[in-house]
Amino acid sequence: MKNNYVVLFCAFFISFLGNAQNFKSSKKIVDKTTKLPLENVAIYNDKDNSTTNQEGFFVFISEKNEINFNLLGYNSLKTTFEALEKQDTIFMEAKAFELKEVVITNVEPFIKKVYNKMEENYSSNYTSNFFLRNVLKKDNSIVVLQDIHAKRAKNTNPKNPDEIQVLNMRKTSFFEKKDQIDFRFPDLNEFFRGLFPALDKNIFTEEDYNDLDFRKILFESKEKNVEGQIFKGYFVINRNDYAVVEFFTTMRDNPEVVPYKKITFSSVQYRTTKYERLMKFSKNSTLNKYYLQLSKLMANVEVVPGTKSGSSFYFNLAMDYFTTSSFTNEKVEPNFATDKDVFKAKFPYSAEFWNNQNQLPLTTELKDFLKRVSENKDKKKEFEIIGNF
């Protein structure tokens, strides 16, 4: 009976049942040469969007019989759902790396033009649906899994730049009761906040890139911050319209010197040893404007318990976001504050809803986590399990 429960538990979460009026494809994408899985591949047509998980798997559902695959540094593919039916794996070929003659140039004028054209290049008012997955680990074990499907209305109001309507949610957490430390997820204000470097406080250099249509610009802050860290990262910029299509930053270059902080009214200490952001932007062909297509936040927090017997451990957070549809004019009815801890959201779960949504497939590690939750669901003395399905 327990085994049946595990199978059903995972099946409801994966939601692989299709909708007769939609086309659907669930495949794996790998590098043609190395055969390694490709993460963050953009899968789309002019109506719907999806992406690949860490293992290269994706689910794409659309009313339109067209699929495009795009990843910077690789040749794009265009096909149909029918053409993919007999393929289990999709192979993407990396573009040939053409090493340019080394020329020392001043990239600051180019970067200034990129910044000056941001208002022109990016849409500041639009509505789109999105998928957000939050995974929290304690050391190497998953303790929280949350998937959210919602509408986001982005606008120019500086006091309230984003309005969120959660359409459905599924979550579960699995903690040992001896763990008394509560981890707070970032709110959506922090998640959507831009972190572009100030022009006058950073050094910009160019690095060779294997696509002649783009330039890769590295940046690094001139001075360390109060925690002794250098802010660094890179841009990938379209040469034709000066739009940033990919942005990565890390705020921890020397985590060992980051000072500890204390939790109020406690002897527990903690410090953030990793904080990285990845953002990818796509162009809407109708509006001729770019929008946030994919975003990732990766953070590690070291915790030192106050008790002598307790050993230090790490919380590792991964937040994965991608838009699931093109722009719409649908009105958003906000039902979740953007300054609230994301995991504190309370909404019902509907298996039927998730059957027809573009979403990240579960990785093997996540499936194992759900199996562990189901196998220990009755051990209420040892474990605290919170979930909505």
Go through the PLM ranges and name each one:
Residues S25-K32, G56, I90:
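A short, amphipathic beta-strand motif
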Residues F23-S25, T33-D46:
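Short, ordered, surface-exposed loop/turn motifs in non-cytosolic proteins
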Residues D48-F57:
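Short, acidic Ser/Thr/Gly-rich low-complexity loop/linker segments typical of extracellular
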Residues N68-T79:
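A short, solvent-exposed loop/turn motif at the edges and junctions
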Residues R193-T250:
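Extended beta-strand-rich segments in extracellular/periplasmic secretory proteins, especially
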Residues V59-E66:
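Short Pro-Gly-centered beta-turn/loop motif in secreted/extracellular proteins
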Residues F91-R215, Y260, V268-F389:
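Surface-exposed, low-complexity/disordered segments
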Residues M1-K28, F389:
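Bacterial Sec-dependent N-terminal signal peptides
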